[in-house]
Structure formats: structure tokens, C-alpha cells
Amino acid sequence: MDFNQSPLLVIWEVTQACDLACVHCRASAQSRRDNRELSLDEGRQLLEEIKSFGDPMMVFTGGDPLKRPDIFDLLRHSVKVGLRTNVTPSATPLLTPAAISHFQDCGISRMAISLDGPDAPTHDSFRGVRGTFDTAESER
């Protein structure tokens, strides 16, 4: 393995906060933000350092990135420094048409939402909250 190569992909778990209770969650999701999360200024500095590695794809994930009030500032800065920027929000009531418009306005390359089953009972059981299948489907 050549550790002098630049990363192709950087995934930043910007928060552990999330309103879902997914059975597979690796983020140890909780309802509130952790006070150890990077500040907006620290996040901007991190993005600049990541860009100095080369041209990796940057993915903002969580928890739910929409639980961070400054997520759109971080996304805009990521695009501004020249990173190919993606976001993976949770399918919760925070994922509104206005939020999706804000993502577009930030200039992100891609947004992904998970579907964890062919129907609402399967998906919602996996996500731990009723109604998330319908939210995800409505944003197609």
C-alpha cells in the first residue's frame, strides 16, 4: 500500500445527532449534538486541509447532517475550496424541499438517501421510526 497516494474519498461524520434509531447505526446516533464536534471554523480549516491532499470526493454524513445549523456553511465552503461535495441526510422531517433547495444552492455534486427495504414496514423497522420510508420516497 502506498501511503503517499492521496485519498479518493473522505467521509466526514459531521455530527452524531439524529432523530432516527437505525439498527445498523455506526454513528452511535443520539438526539443531541456532541459538544466535541468541530466548530464551523475548525470545519472550514479541515476542508482546506483535505483539499490540500488533492481532489478527493468529500461526503458529509452523520448522524444527520441537517442537525447541524451550520451544515450549509460547511457545504458551501467545501464547494468553494474545490472539493466534489456530497451529502447523505436522514429521511426525517428536517429533509424538506427547502433543505434540498439549500443543498442545490450550495453547489453540491450529489445527495443520497437510504432506502432499506421495498416497503414502509421493512424500511421503517430498520430505521426505528415510522414514516421515514414515505419521507424518503417523497424526495425522489
Regions found by a protein language model. Give the residues of each.
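Alpha-helical elements of the RecA-like P-loop NTPase motor core of helicases
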Residues: 23, 97, 121-124, 134
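Glycine-rich S-adenosyl-L-methionine
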Residues: 128-140
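A short acidic, helix-capping loop that chelates divalent metal ions and anchors anionic groups
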Residues: 29-33, 119-127
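Gly/Ser/Thr-rich beta-alpha loop segments that engage phosphate groups in nucleotides
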Residues: 64-65, 113, 119, 130
